[in-house]
Amino acid sequence: MTSADQPDPDRLLAIYLQDHRAGAAAGVALAQRCARSNEGTPLGDVLAEIAREIDEDREALDDIMGRLDVSESQLKSLGARAGELVGRVKTNGVLTGYSPSSRVVELEGLIAGVSGKRQLWASLSATASTRSELDEAELRALFARATSQIERLEAEHHRAAVTAFSGAGTAL
C-alpha cells in the first residue's frame, strides 16, 4: 500500500470530531430533558449538575475543534437531534406522563453517551503528543470528569432500576 492509498489522518480526525460533536448535541438535549423530568427530586438535582457538565464538555469539544480548524457538521448534528427526538417516542407502560421504566432507559442512554465521550477524550489524549493543538492536561481532566459522570449516573441507574422493577426502592 502506498502513502497515496492511506487515508488522511486530518480528514479522519475531522470526521471523528464531527461525529462526536453531533452526539454531544443530542447528549446535552437528553440530559437537560431528564433533569427537567425529575426536577424537584434528588435525582433531578444530580441530573441538572450532570447536564450542566455535559454542556460544558460540548463547549470544550467546540474549542478543541476550533483549534484544529474543524467545523461542526450541521447535517450530522441535525440527524443526532432528530434521533434524540425519536427516542422520546417509546412504549413505557404509561399512557401519559413519565414512567419509572423511562427513567431507567434514559439513564442508560446517558451512561452510553458519556462512555462514548470518555473514549473521545482518551483517543484525543493518545494523539496529543503529535498535535500541538491538543492539551493533554485538559484532556485528562475531561476524561476524569466523564468518569465521575458515569459513576454518578450508574448509581442513579441502580436506584431507578430498583424503584421501577422491584417496587423496593424509595422515591427518586
Which positions does each model-derived feature cover?
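Inter-helical turn/loop segments and adjacent helix faces that build the functional surface
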Residues: 33-45, 68-69, 123-140
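Actinobacteria-biased recognition of intrinsically disordered, low-complexity terminal regions
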Residues: 1-7, 171-172
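Preference for long, well-ordered alpha-helical segments
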Residues: 110-172
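Alpha-helical transition-metal enzyme core signature, strongest for iron centers
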Residues: 17-31, 47-61, 82-89, 110-117, ...
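Carboxylate-rich helix-loop segments that flank metal/cofactor sites and access channels
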Residues: 68-100
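Amphipathic, non-membrane alpha-helical segments in soluble helical-bundle scaffolds
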Residues: 10-21, 44-51, 72-79, 100-114, ...
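Alpha-helical bundle segments that constitute or directly flank the non-heme di-iron/ferroxidase center
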Residues: 6-39, 105-128
